[in-house]
Regions:
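Short amphipathic alpha-helical segments that predominantly mediate membrane engagement
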Residues: 1-71, 87-141
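Signature of dsDNA virion morphogenesis modules
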Residues: 132-268
Length: 268
């Protein structure tokens, strides 16, 4: 079916807007869906549409993360068309741990003044499912807003550290040191005695970090990762795509029990 006049619209969802209000960003899983549709010939746009460069939020060292949903507003494109493009590819990425288990995709169609949500397989979503997915991104942004607006007890350590992304602050850090193999929270003060004991016992074994990628490069075409159609973790004729994040704005830190990357460390 011809989709030349149709468009898939994504709305910027910067969960770290409270710290970086002028950054236009989408979550990394959302960017992947955008790339998949673009590569299939679907016209894609991001709202608000202005002169700011598009960035993406990302997380590293995280075992369990409630990812913000990728919500796609479809205009003049049948739901089954985009579902066929995305469904099997997305399920395979999740099976291979290329996406967070909680990452979700929903399609939205406005018909006769009524807004209808459809799941990844193209089936209508229930009212409860619709409410949950439409509120999820707002909730994560509110949790982050509360955490960064908590006054730091020491101005040298201005980054709050949560426990398991719960919104509860249990410590503070001066900053982040990162390399290709590790993520280290630097000059950490643990303010919560329970968290302190759990770190000492190994129950809280590592750190997860959320940030905004301002500059990134695709390993396949060596161009701007946001603008190209290659997707990190997918295989192409000349290899597997890897995104190289060259400039990032640190935003969110959390002590976690089961970090994906065992090299994430807490430096006291």
């Amino acid at each position: 079916m011809n989709t030349e006049n149709g468009v898939a619209t994504f709305f910027a969802e910067n969960r770290y807007a409270a710290m970086y209000p002028h950054i236009l960003a989408v979550p990394q899983p959302t960017l992947h869906v955008m790339k998949r549709l673009r590569a299939a010939g679907i016209r894609v746009r991001v709202e608000p549409s202005d002169q700011r460069p598009l960035c993406f939020t990302f997380q590293r060292g995280i075992g369990d993360w409630l990812a913000d949903p990728a919500i796609v507003l479809l205009a003049s494109i049948p739901v089954n068309i985009v579902s066929n493009i995305v469904f099997s590819w997305w399920q395979e990425r999740k099976r291979r741990d290329r996406e967070f288990p909680s990452a979700t995709v929903a399609f939205v169609v406005e018909e006769d003044g009524d807004t209808r949500y459809y799941s990844l397989d193209g089936e209508p979503m229930s009212r409860q499912e619709t409410h949950e997915i439409s509120q999820r991104a707002q909730r994560s942004a509110k949790v982050f807003y509360r955490s960064i607006n908590t006054p730091a007890p020491d101005p040298r350590r201005r980054y709050p550290i949560q426990r398991d992304h719960s919104g509860t602050i249990v410590g503070w850090a001066a900053g982040l040191r990162h390399s290709e193999k590790s993520l280290d929270l630097v000059d950490v003060f643990v303010s919560d005695p329970i968290a302190e004991a759990d770190i000492a016992s190994g129950k809280l074994a590592g750190v997860s970090v959320g940030a905004i990628a301002q500059r990134s490069t695709c390993s396949i075409c060596l161009s701007n990762y946001v603008a190209c159609d290659h997707i990190a973790g997918d295989d192409y004729s000349n290899g597997r795509c890897v995104v190289r994040i060259e400039r990032a704005l640190p935003a969110e830190f959390s002590f976690v029990q089961d970090p994906i990357n065992p090299e994430t460390k807490i430096l006291r």
